[in-house]
């Protein structure tokens, strides 16, 4: 004999003919003859059973009537070299039996089959099975499949078999695949209706209440399975006192704006949460040193340089809802670069920068309202500057740091309101080219240049400004110093990515741990190589239903948007 497969085939022939068989597995009225030695070699259960005096050495029968005959027969065939023939119908029975008999290779084969064939049609069934038999590998995979396909599953016949504990787990998960929080109450109501179970406060707590539309909150109030429970109505009556909720991962899109390494084009990238990668969704011809602002899910890019040596006054935009570029936007009042960009609920602002005529710094702030035919003057900064940090907080425009006359950095912090400019606590160090973000009621800045004289030192500093106490706090430094990085806030976390470090484009990203006050390199948000990220914006998905009047069948109307 040349190999073990030939040997096992011979031994299986002995079994089929009854030669040397010394054990018979009895299941109800069925018998399976086998060899103790072969079973013990493949099954930990049989190994212990036959070697530790659990049965008399002369005993010829083992009764396993509590197991499924066909599954035991298939597994003993498997031990004797016959491949398992797995299907969606039999794999659960075979896996449960293999787990009881402790046949490791069969367990692995069954698990791999389930993982390979998991889909929206069977994920609930496999999740319930895995939860019952405590199979964490399948439970985790099937649960993630449920999260990914939840809006398909609310009309699945197996949806009603999910327990309240499972629904709490599903509705609480950040990765629930809904693009608008209004769909979470729809999922809850569909489950309540399918089970005819009354709502509980524990289920309502899973919803991100502060993100729900008034129409959906009214729908919860009026639904009989909710309104009939006093505790639920009491909870809904007090939602004004709940903490602000953070969006789920799929309810926003992370959109980055930068310069790609492909002929240095402007590149619009979108973060794929499922693959943990950035994917380019659009690009256009080269431009750099432009300002970025986002209003109504449209990304505006103002000024900068194009392929000519001159600064530009052009404004272009990318509509994230239609995935299209917009070119018919009024030009800036004059060409400029290295300016700041901001937006409030109505206007786009272009702040400071370098003018084209003589490369002089400008202090002007211009604003434009979409649909208007021109930009208008809004205000002037106290001194001309470029490459400063800008932020919009509590209706005020904050301008911090930047490069001023003499190519030096400044540490000034000022805010602009209808009453004019107000000075605030200066930065701890003179800075420029840093990134800024408003998060949790504070202004955060990171990276850039810091130097009191010549602008040449790349910074890894991270600072936060509290407008209530008018004070700066120094946080843990970045692992990698960088200028012009992107700083963004998503899901109650801070991220920084891209920029230039030691004159080289860096594709690294870092995540801030507030409790530990430390930054860690983030492998999940690594950028495309040689990609300069100018800005990263969380874009909230919008739906036509947001402007729809409430009706008694609003949830049915909401359901019609699934898949759109």
Swiss-Prot record:
- In this record, what's one Pfam family? BACK
| Coiled-coil segments on the chain, per record | none
Q: Name one GO cellular component term.
A: host cell cytoplasm
Predominant location: host cell
Q: Could you list this entry's UniProt keywords, alphabetically sorted.
A: Early protein, Host cytoplasm, Host-virus interaction, Kelch repeat, Modulation of host E3 ubiquitin ligases by virus, Modulation of host ubiquitin pathway by virus, Repeat, Ubl conjugation pathway
- Please give the SUPFAM superfamilies that the UniProt record associates with this protein: Kelch motif, POZ domain
GO biological process, alphabetically ordered: symbiont-mediated perturbation of host ubiquitin-like protein modification; symbiont-mediated suppression of host NF-kappaB cascade
Compartment(s): Host cytoplasm
Judging by the UniProt lineage, the source's domain of life is: Viruses
- Where is the chain membrane-spanning? none
| Segments annotated as Kelch repeats | 252-297, 298-346, 347-395, 397-441, 442-492, 494-539
The record places domain BTB at 21-88
What one GO molecular function would you report for this record? ubiquitin-like ligase-substrate adaptor activity
The family annotation for this protein states:
Belongs to the poxviruses A55 protein family.
Free-text function comment from the UniProt entry: Probable substrate-specific adapter of CUL3-containing E3 ubiquitin-protein ligases which mediate the ubiquitination and subsequent proteasomal degradation of host target proteins.
Q: Per the record, what about its domains? A: The BTB domain is responsible for the interaction with CUL3 while the Kelch repeat domains supposely serve to recruit the cellular substrates.
What do we know about how this protein assembles, alone or with others?
A: Interacts (via BTB domain) with host CUL3.
Protein name per its UniProtKB record: Kelch repeat and BTB domain-containing protein A55
């Amino acid at each position: 004999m040349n190999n073990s497969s030939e040997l096992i085939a011979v031994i299986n022939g002995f079994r089929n003919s009854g030669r040397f068989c010394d054990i018979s597995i009895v299941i109800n009225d069925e018998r399976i003859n086998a060899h103790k030695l072969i079973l013990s070699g493949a099954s930990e259960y049989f190994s212990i059973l036959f070697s530790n005096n659990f049965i008399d050495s002369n005993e010829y029968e083992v009764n396993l009537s509590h197991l499924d005959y066909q599954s035991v027969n298939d597994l003993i065939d498997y031990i004797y070299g016959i491949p398992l023939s797995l299907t969606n119908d039999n794999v659960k029975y075979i896996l449960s039996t293999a787990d009881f008999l402790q046949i490791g290779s069969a367990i692995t084969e069954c698990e791999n089959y389930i993982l390979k064939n998991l889909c929206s049609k069977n994920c609930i069934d496999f999740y319930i099975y895995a939860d019952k038999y405590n199979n964490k590998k399948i439970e985790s995979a099937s649960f993630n499949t449920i999260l990914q396909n939840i809006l398909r599953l609310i009309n699945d016949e197996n949806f009603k078999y999910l327990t309240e504990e499972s629904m709490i787990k599903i509705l609480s998960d950040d990765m629930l695949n809904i693009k608008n929080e209004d769909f979470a109450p729809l999922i809850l109501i569909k489950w309540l209706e399918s089970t005819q179970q009354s709502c509980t406060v524990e289920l309502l707590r899973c919803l991100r209440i502060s993100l729900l539309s008034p129409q959906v909150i009214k729908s919860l109030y009026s639904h009989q399975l909710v309104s009939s429970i006093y505790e639920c109505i009491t909870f809904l009556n007090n939602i004004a006192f709940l903490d602000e909720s953070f969006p789920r991962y799929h309810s926003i899109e992370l959109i980055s704006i930068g310069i790609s390494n492909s002929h240095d084009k402007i590149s619009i990238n979108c973060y794929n949460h499922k693959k943990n990668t950035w994917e380019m969704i659009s690009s256009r011809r080269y431009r750099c040193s432009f300002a970025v602002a986002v209003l109504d899910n449209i990304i505006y890019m103002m000024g900068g340089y194009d392929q000519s040596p001159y600064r530009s006054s052009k404004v272009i935009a990318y509509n994230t809802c239609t995935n299209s570029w917009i070119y018919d936007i009024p030009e800036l009042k004059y060409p400029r670069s290295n300016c700041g960009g901001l937006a409030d609920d109505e206007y786009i602002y272009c702040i400071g920068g370098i003018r084209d005529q003589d490369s002089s710094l400008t202090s002007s702030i211009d604003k434009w309202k979409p649909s208007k035919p021109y930009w208008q003057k809004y205000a002037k900064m106290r001194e001309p500057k470029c490459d400063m940090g800008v932020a919009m907080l509590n209706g005020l425009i904050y301008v911090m740091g930047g490069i001023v006359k003499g190519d030096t950095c400044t540490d000034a912090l000022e805010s602009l309101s209808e009453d004019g400019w107000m000075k605030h606590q200066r930065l701890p160090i003179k800075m420029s080219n840093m990134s800024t973000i408003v998060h949790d009621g504070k202004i955060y800045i990171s990276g850039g240049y810091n130097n009191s004289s010549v602008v040449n030192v790349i910074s890894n500093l991270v600072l936060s400004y509290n407008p209530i106490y008018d004070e700066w706090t120094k946080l843990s430094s970045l692992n990698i110093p960088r200028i012009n990085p992107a700083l963004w806030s998503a899901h109650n976390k801070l991220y920084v990515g891209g920029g230039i470090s030691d004159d080289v484009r860096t594709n690294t990203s870092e995540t801030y741990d507030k409790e530990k006050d430390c930054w860690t390199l983030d492998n999940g948000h690594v950028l495309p190589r040689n990609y300069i990220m100018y800005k990263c914006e969380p874009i909230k998905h919008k739906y036509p239903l947001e402007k729809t009047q409430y009706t008694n069948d609003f949830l049915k109307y909401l359901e019609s948007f699934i898949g759109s």
